[in-house]
Amino acid sequence: MRQLEHYIDVGQKRLRCGYTTGTCAAAAAHAASCKLLNGQAPDVVMIETPAGIDAVIEIEEEGCGKDWASCGVRKDGGDDPDITDGMLVVARVSYVDEPGVVIDGGEGVGRVTREGLDQPVGAAAINSVPRQMVTSEVEAIAHDCDYDGGLRVEISIPAGAELAKRTFNPRLGIEGGLSVLGTSGIVKPMSEDALIASVQLELRQRHAEGAKDILLCPGNYGWDFARDELALDLKRGVQCSNYLGAALDYACQLGFSSILFVAHIGKMVKVAAGVMNTHSRVADARLETMAAHAALCGASRELVAQVMASITTDEAIMHLKEAGLLKETMASIMEAVAKQLRHRVGEGLQIEAVTFSKEHGLLGKTAGADRLIALHATG
């Protein structure tokens, strides 16, 4: 298995990145399309990832029939401690009558059984960015081979059903296998010490550049919302991953004047409960917290039970919205967020928060958030 030679340096550590399952699926689909359309699969495939990093991936196995071809690659997780490292990801490409590229999941790829996830109920748990990557690779090969007919791509993970039992997929409403994931195409190492150190490094850099007011987001969802929906300048921003508490503590040490925290509701509702490391292995409490605040706002026992039984925060929001209690519940949650954040940072700086969901948009702000939004606005 050819390894990705892309590293990130954190302090004295040099950590190697890996590929997402989405990148593996795209590479396998690329090779299988070559095998089907011109009779020869390449030994290696180069994929340009959304992160702008070229991934050169070995093709480990291949097969073919009269109207189909398949190829597989092994996932390279880099220095990330991931149960999917080394697993085989296979793409089977076949001819279909309908034009375009149709993508589905086969053995070991989960099926969506509940609403509120990236894909609709009944679809294979292959998220949007991997689908785009697979489609792009297959269309490029079809174009090179002067083929303008339809193609079906089935992604399978032979070990996926067993590995999925060790993930949160069953609880999330994804049954029968793993999800094919990735927004950047690259897996960055998840060493906790290294991640916290990298967050601290970015905070030091912003401080050294003269920034007094800092924007914090857990990851890409918050980053994109801050830029696209709030029109914020990200130059004074730092992604803190799940380590909000560590980021706040260090920001206080550096002496920033204010912090604006922008996060998806799935992260923010944990903060309302005082959870400052939002990784799922540390704590959850999302639905319990939403249910408690709904009850404080007058929710019926039935509605509280619906919130508690939800699979995702978006599903819980839907129930609150239908009951006409979303606005009051979010105001209560954001008041709790404000108290938790101010307790963590003390009186030395102003801290405010904004939360949202991809499905419902802006959901809530703390009382002084608009002032900090104006400070970070572009233009």
Which role fits each region the language model picked out?
Residues V129, T312-A316, T366:
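Secondary-structure junction/capping motif
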Residues M1-R166, P170-L172, G368:
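Generic N-terminal targeting/processing segments that precede catalytic cores or assembly contacts
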Residues L88, E229-L232, T366-L372:
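Surface-exposed flexible segments
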Residues R2, H6-D9, R16, L172-L178, ...:
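A structural signal for small-residue-enriched, beta-sheet-centric alpha/beta enzyme cores
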Residues R114, A164, F225, K270-A272, ...:
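Generic domain-boundary/flexible-linker signal
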